[in-house]
Amino acid sequence: MKFLNEHIKNNTFKQVYLIYGEETYLVYQYRDRLKQAIIGDDTMNYSCYEGAKIDIKELLTTADTLPFFAERRLIVVQDSGFFKSSTEGLAEYIRSMPEYLHMIFIESEVDKRNRVYKAVSEKGYVSEMKYQPDSVLIRWVEGLVKAEGRTITRPAVQHLLDKTGVQMSNIRTEVEKLMCYTLDKPEITEADIDEICTTQIQNKIFDMITAISMKRQKEALDLYYDLLMLREPPMRILYLITRQFNMMLQVKELVLQRYDQAAIAKQLGIAGFLVNKYVNQSKHFAAEQIREALEYFAESETAVKTGRLDDKMAVELIIVKYSKK
């Protein structure tokens, strides 16, 4: 993204771009920013082709058409499949494309061995838009809120992300709902978030931990696959599982110290109704089992980061291990 921002800022563009990846919000944002920077509102010299049935001859004929009273012609090609299958003549064309021509390819997935991919890499610039880490998302949400003249604390932003997951389009929608809901309030609070924001991730994580604790393995795995379908990254799921087990351990220890529900809620900074849920989950594990699980989670994370274990498989193995009867 750094180089794309520089190209746009300095008005120094590559002739061809490939933007792809799982974070579609960023994919489309940079498509639109590049389009505006390269050609502005010129509709005469702009063409867009979309879908798997694009006529390559028609596309190249358009590409060979000189721009009308302008220096540039821009063609955007979306979801073509050109980067996963053989496309006659396109790679060669890209390598020798006319100077007036600019092309932006938008794809969800690519094969880096593909000839068209290699041609774009050599001639232009390729940018993969991955799901952003929490640190980036937190700053982004803070910026969105600040732009509206409001404030929000870091814990409140994290609480929002726990509900929404990492998809930026979903986060943006929920922030906009919050802005409307809290129209006269200077600060967005966790209570506001609980009141208005749609919970997609947190409830499924909670239900998954409950299924694990009750040894309902199929249910736990089904919930995990649901989270993957929501495009929640496996390592973030592991982070949330770890956090839930940490909370279970703290609740269990406070119960042993004879803290009541209200005192536990105050001590841990959580809602009272959550205490009972954590108590019920923790009943199915000894404190030492939870500590051992937390160590195993850390080992699994290290195995993924060092390339010894696939991230999806790592979380699946955790679920199977701790939901076994």
For every predicted segment, state its role.
Residues M1-K325:
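Conserved beta/loop motifs at nucleotide-recognition and modification sites
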